[in-house]
From Swiss-Prot:
Residues 1-26 are annotated as: Disordered. It holds the Pfam family Methyltransf_16. S-adenosyl-L-methionine binds at residues 64, 90-92, 112, 145, 168. GO terms for cellular component: cytoplasm. Disulfide bonds: none annotated. Belongs to the class I-like SAM-binding methyltransferase superfamily. EFM7 family. Keywords: Cytoplasm, Methyltransferase, S-adenosyl-L-methionine, Transferase. One of its GO terms (biological process) is methylation. This is Protein N-terminal and lysine N-methyltransferase EFM7. It comes from the Eukaryota. The keyword Methyltransferase applies.
Length: 256
């Protein structure tokens, strides 16, 4: 046996078995049903088959209660988005933006962290759910909170502000509150609204979640609580905290 053959055999000891690394989770799907489609909605599509990424460190692989609540809220109050400029931060599956596009947003800009899989997944949902005649009005953009706004406002055909900014299940990012609020302050139209919806996924940190609505005042924004409802919690593992985790909080924020 040659030295080369011996070396190759030795190196072969370190070859990974085919099943050594777990297979990357595949995308999966969730169905969302629009319960009350408003008369002014440009599309009467009711069933939305959402593709979700297989896994995500940013939790974009789940369809959260907050996203479902937000989508229903837009159908209930379509004037929030009809012929309006809409921005969604941290969109994940982009359900609220998709509903805004179906209702007839002038422009819906859907954003999330610029991860390739996440962006491709959002674009897939836009391509498969939004009718061709409305696709031009729904734009997908990777965005890191706190960065320059030009990549967002370039989609507005001359406008520089958004009539509605959607923050669905984002306030658990406590160290990002300032960036979220600065972005909201800077990009919200004078008479616009931000719609903030969340569930307390970590009940012991609920006060830190709610601090968002105190900190917003430092940015010249006024919070208005819409309601708190109880839905089925996303996870069943801890009965003691189930009630808190079942909560869905909804707020508006406007310029003071």
């Amino acid at each position: 046996m040659s030295d080369t053959e011996s070396l190759n055999d030795a190196l072969g000891l370190f070859d990974e078995p085919e099943d050594f690394r777990p297979e990357k989770p595949k995308e999966h799907y969730a169905n969302y049903e629009r319960i009350d489609v408003p008369d002014i909605s440009k599309s009467k599509i009711t069933n939305l088959k959402l593709q979700l990424v297989g896994s995500s460190p940013l939790w974009g692989h789940l369809l959260w209660n907050a996203g479902i609540y937000t989508a229903r809220h837009l159908d209930k109050y379509p004037e929030l988005v009809s012929n309006k400029n809409v921005l969604e931060l941290g969109a994940a599956s982009a359900l609220p933006s998709l509903v805004a596009g179906l209702i007839g947003a002038k422009r819906a800009v859907v954003t999330d962290y610029p991860d390739a899989d996440l962006m491709a997944n959002i674009q897939y949902n836009v391509n498969t759910i939004i009718p061709d005649e409305l696709k031009e009005n729904v734009r997908v953009e990777g965005y890191i909170w706190g960065n320059e706004y030009d990549p967002l406002t370039i989609h507005l055909d001359g406008d520089k502000k958004f009539d509605l900014i959607i923050l669905s299940d984002l306030v658990f990012n406590h160290n990002q509150h300032d960036k979220l609020l600065q972005t909201t302050k800077d990009l919200l139209a004078t008479n616009g609204k931000a719609l903030v919806v969340f569930s307390p996924h970590r009940p012991h940190l609920l006060e830190a979640d709610l601090q968002f609505f105190e900190t917003c005042k430092e940015y010249g924004l006024t919070p208005e609580k819409i309601e708190m409802v109880n839905w089925k919690p996303m996870f069943e593992e801890d009965e003691e905290t189930a009630e808190v985790r079942s909560r869905v909080y909804a707020y508006y924020m406007t310029h003071a």
